[in-house]
Amino acid sequence: MSMRSALAFLRIFSALLALGSAVPAAAQSPQPSARVVLVDKDNDGGYRTTTNRSYTGVRDRVIKARMLERLRDFLSPVRLPRSIGLLAAECDGGDDASPFYHSGYRTITVCYQFIVLVETITDKMMAAIKKDPKAYPFPITREEFLWGLIGGVLLHESGHALFDVLDVPVFGREEDAADQISILVALHLRPQLAEAAVKSYAYFWHTVPDPDSGVKNGKMNEDFADEHGTGSQRLYNGLCLGYGHSPAVFGKFVSAGWLPQARAKGCAQEYARLESAFVRTVLPFIDTKKMAEVQAVDWLAANYGPAQPATAVTVRNTPPPAATARSDAPPGGQGPVGRGTP
């Protein structure tokens, strides 16, 4: 495949981004049985039951939306050397528990608490936009913000999983690389979805205050030791990728002052480096036939639209019995149910 063809391929398919150089794809032999699977337990389909009334409704909603099945379908074109498991559950960590990837079990866990949190954040964001619409460069609907944010976090965790399973070395913080995956992937969905993803990402991080940088009692603020960047850094990095990919679409973020001109000047080059990394390190893992099926789907409508049946893609992979996502998974396919931070 020529470089021109590879770049054209990238523009119609969203998968993942790898930073730096990676082990050549030919050196890793995908196993025929390796795939993204739902980690079933007691025939729950990957959606763990909960006795907490605060989350029983959430479980019903994500089952109806086929959230795990759709994430599995979305990742299905990637030829995996080892399987990745998906499950949804009430996680440890209280009300602010977030989705996370567990490298020991190679499992992505979606926490019910996270869905409640995002719904609350969405309501607050919609109220803020309604109160002062001129403060936000682009209009955004409740559905776009809600599912743009949820989808972005799931892609972020999928990035961690793919870095691990594909043995992709990452230079710098892996959290930054996972952020870049979620934006790069979103930018290559349909235009409406790409715009919704970048807007929701920017508006969310715009509301997150940065930690105090002062020294207190002779000790630096330990918030800066976190593996994640600050809210402002994540905001600027995401906007730079969006602007670097589509300056005509996202130029209003620059003119409105959300993305400084000094940073915006180099965004096309930043984006080009990321795109080149994808073509060199990940493209050989992609099944083009399955890619065509995935690319044809309007994921926002098919996943979560009020009137759209979730039948747009037929995936030929049938999930295996309980806990076969990894041979050493705990009895019953429970997998980790901890606390994550996107």
Task: Write out the residue ranges for each language-model feature.
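Pan-zinc metallopeptidase signature
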Residues: 219-342
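Acidic/histidine-rich, surface-exposed loop or edge segments in extracytoplasmic proteins
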Residues: 34-59, 162-166
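Zn2+-dependent metallopeptidase catalytic core
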Residues: 57-82, 118
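Short pre-active-site segment immediately N-terminal to the catalytic Zn-binding motif
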Residues: 133-152, 166-170
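Active-site recognition of the HExxH zinc-binding catalytic motif
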Residues: 110, 152-165, 179, 183
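Catalytic zinc-binding patch centered on the HExxH motif and its immediate surroundings
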Residues: 88-109, 114-124
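An active-site-proximal "capping" alpha-helix that borders the catalytic cofactor pocket
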Residues: 171-189
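Bacterial N-terminal signal peptides
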Residues: 10-21
